[in-house]
Regions:
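Outer membrane beta-barrel strand-and-loop segments of large Gram-negative receptors
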Residues: 362, 366-370, 411-422, 499, ...
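Short, acidic, small-residue-rich periplasmic hinge/interaction motif at the N-terminus
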Residues: 5-10, 40-45, 55-107, 115, ...
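Gram-negative outer-membrane beta-barrel transporters
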Residues: 530-532, 553-640
């Protein structure tokens, strides 16, 4: 915290304040509308947050980071610039972007879901039915989800049903989410166990001055949020958000879905012992599909199948941060995560007799200790060092019938515990006033099979002119597989787990970056990149690779002999909100390939080749005192179509259940027509003295773009 810094509203002369000894501030009687907040302190570059929305019913909570200036001139005038386009993590050199809470409330198609919001950024391919994040042609499950500096299980409702690594809607509501970092490649040394990207999310602190409550009702369900002080004297606060939905309007491939989630954070600052926080997120999902009781209407196998699934996910922890004067801090977190999936499917014959087709039970519990020590030795040199110990407990059993009416056979089964241990050291060095070097090293060790990896990371940034910036970053990365992969069993091996000795999937990222500040409100960023993947688990003598994995299970023996290569360029032109108008155009051109166990190179499943996004929004201040806000937001996405493998018709006809078989020698060689996805949001906010009302209509995929789910054999035709 920086004491006695100046904070003011830039557009209103005489409206401002000074932070107290703990860096806290409050500006009373701010008019309703958009405002720009500036913070300044001697020896630091000014920080600025533009177009912050102030409403009548909720106070705005801001954490304004200031970067120490390395300029050695006796006197210098620094023009305040927005840091919205940069990551909060100052050791990020390329491929990083901050997702602000303010954006979360504006972008069309976001549905208050951070995973869908980042699909507007360059390098990310969006989906309609799923919020899975595919970066540069990588599968969504290769991304790491983090909350409060801890890796957490997939935090999405109906996780891994539509796409492994994604879901339908995030359990983390924008009501409680704070400013967060999103990385698309070449990320700093403190991040590991990820090969495509990292979504580093934070929960914000609640209002420590007064209670505020929010109620939201829509077709998705009921959303209740509350925040306020636990102790005004000690500035302790709480915030929580609960959502509940039981609606038949939601459907996934003919199934009904119910969901609920809870998020919270308790914050306890102290005078001498640092700051303590207790936080958590959780969800419960139910999904089920019924079979068609009229046998005359049976056309596909799905018509005579019935399934029921129930999912649980929870993550929570206790964090403590202690500042040693103003140049060092220690943050330690003890956390736990839990995920459970219970599911089953049965098939009916024409006599309406049922036989089991699939049975799944899995429980995963992680107990985590992580600690980071950050030290600023000077205004030119900062070092960060940390470690994480993750004790993983697992119990899982998956059984599938090879053919209809046959007995279930075990596909994956295991019970026990293992550990993933990691450590890193990362430094940022201001070589000169224009050159910055970020370098570090990360390592991890898996006790399950004694596999390890040591990964250097380095980035160099050059401020060529006040408006132009060049950067280059390189890093090595690795990721362990989901636990079920290690415990796959086959007929030939009996009770022996065939994949227990699998090594990490590894990757190397190289990314260039050019940023140009066209004006205070407009930025251009161009980032070419190349990613090499190696030691990828593949099936021997086959085109299968985990780089294309989208199903929730693997049933074959794998070897670390696969490769991958992603090459492309990301371009973003963004005009930040000013006078009620903002827009962003982002584009990605890329080619994503992989080499299977047969030694042949193929397109990856997620190789769309291009993604172009266009966002625009406009706000009008209405009402007698211009206190109400009408907002219209639009997003259009044009992207390459879904890829799929051609059907092997002869093999399909010879299959006892007529299950569709694919020609794996031509994996993902087919592609559907390009997709045009349109989303919109229209909202009107009425600000009264102590309450505000917002009415909104949100449309997802109003253009009717169709996605590829798969193929089914029609038994009638």
């Amino acid at each position: 915290p920086i004491p006695y810094a100046t904070v003011r509203l830039s557009e209103k002369e005489g409206t401002g304040t000074i932070t107290d000894s703990l860096g806290r501030f409050s500006i009373p009687q701010v008019p309703v509308g958009r405002h720009t907040v500036e913070a300044a302190f001697m020896g630091y570059e000014p920080g600025i947050f533009r177009e912050i929305l102030v409403t009548s019913a909720k106070e705005v909570y801001l954490e304004i980071p200031l970067k120490e200036s390395v300029n050695e001139l006796n006197e210098v005038v620094i023009r305040a610039r927005t840091n919205k386009e940069e990551a909060m993590n100052k050791m990020a050199t390329t491929g990083a972007r901050m997702l602000s809470v303010e954006e979360a409330s504006r972008y069309a198609g976001g549905f208050d879901d951070p995973a869908r919001l980042v699909s507007s950024f360059a390098g990310v391919a969006p989906s309609v039915s799923s919020n899975g994040i595919s970066i540069h042609g990588n599968a969504p499950h290769l991304l790491q989800w983090r909350l409060e500096d801890v890796e957490i299980p997939n935090p999405n409702h109906f996780a891994d049903i539509a796409t492994l690594g994604g879901g339908i809607l995030s359990s983390l509501s924008s009501q409680v989410l704070g400013n967060s970092d999103f990385f698309t490649g070449a990320f700093p040394a403190e991040y590991g166990n990820a090969v495509s990207g990292v979504f580093d999310m934070k929960l914000r602190n609640g209002n420590n001055q007064k209670n505020e409550n929010t109620l939201q009702v829509g077709i998705m369900g009921i959303d209740v949020a509350s925040e306020g002080p636990l102790s005004k004297k000690h500035k302790a606060s709480y915030i929580f958000n609960y959502r509940y939905s039981t609606t038949g309007l939601l459907n996934l491939e003919g199934g009904k879905m119910d969901y609920q989630d809870l998020n919270f954070k308790l914050n306890f600052p102290t005078q001498k012992a640092g700051t303590f926080s207790v936080w958590g997120t959780s969800l419960i999902d139910k999904f089920g599909s019924d079979f068609e009781k009229n046998t005359d209407k049976w056309e596909y196998m799905s018509n005579r199948s019935e399934s029921k699934d129930k999912q649980y996910m929870a993550a929570g922890g206790i964090s403590h941060r202690y500042f040693f004067n103003n140049d060092a801090s220690l943050k330690t977190t003890i956390a736990g995560t839990y995920s459970q999936l219970d599911g089953g499917a049965i098939l009916f014959n024409h006599s309406l007799e049922s036989t089991p087709y699939m049975d799944l039970n899995s429980k995963h519990t992680n107990l985590i200790l992580t600690s980071t020590f950050n030290r600023k030795f000077s205004n030119r040199f900062t070092n960060k060092i940390g470690f994480t110990y993750n004790a993983m407990f697992y119990q899982m059993n998956l059984a599938i019938a090879p053919y209809e009416a046959e007995s279930l056979e075990t596909v994956s089964q295991g019970k026990g515990n293992t550990s993933l241990i990691s450590a890193y050291n990362s430094s940022s060095v201001g070589l000169t006033e224009r050159w910055t070097l970020n370098a570090g090293i990360y390592g991890q060790f898996l006790t399950l099979n004694n596999k390890w990896s040591v990964e250097p990371r380095i980035g160099l940034k050059w401020q060529a002119t006040p408006k132009a910036t060049f950067a280059l970053a390189y890093g090595m990365y690795s990721r362990m597989e989901k636990m079920d992969v290690y415990f796959v069993k086959t007929k030939s091996t009996g009770d022996k787990s065939v994949n227990k000795e699998l090594d990490f999937t590894k990757a190397q990222h190289v990314m260039l970056s050019f940023g140009y500040k066209i004006s205070d409100r407009m930025n251009l960023k161009i980032e070419p990149y190349i990613q090499f993947l190696h030691d990828v688990p593949v099936m021997a003598d086959c085109s299968y690779s985990v780089l294309n994995r989208s199903d929730f299970y693997v049933e074959d023996a794998l070897v670390n002999k696969g490769r991958g290569r992603n090459i492309g360029i990301d371009i973003t032109l963004e005009r930040f909100l000013e006078k009620g108008l903002y827009y962003m155009i982002s584009g990605s051109l890329f080619d994503s390939r992989y080499r299977g166990g047969d030694g042949v190179w193929y397109n990856t499943k997620f190789n769309r080749n291009y993604v172009i996004n266009g966002l625009i929004g406009k706000e009008w201040m209405l009402g007698r005192n211009r206190q109400n806000i009408l907002s219209i937001n639009l997003k259009l996405t044009l992207q390459g179509g879904d890829r799929y493998s051609p059907i092997d018709r002869e093999a399909t006809m010879n299959h006892p259940d007529k299950e569709v078989q694919y020609d794996e020698t031509k994996a993902f060689s087919k592609q559907y027509s390009p997709m045009l996805i349109g989303n919109y949001t229209v909202s009107y906010r009425i600000n009264k003295k102590k309450v505000s009302h917002e009415f909104a209509v949100k449309g997802l995929n109003f253009t009717g773009a169709k996605e590829h789910y798969g193929h089914e054999y029609n038994v009638k035709t």
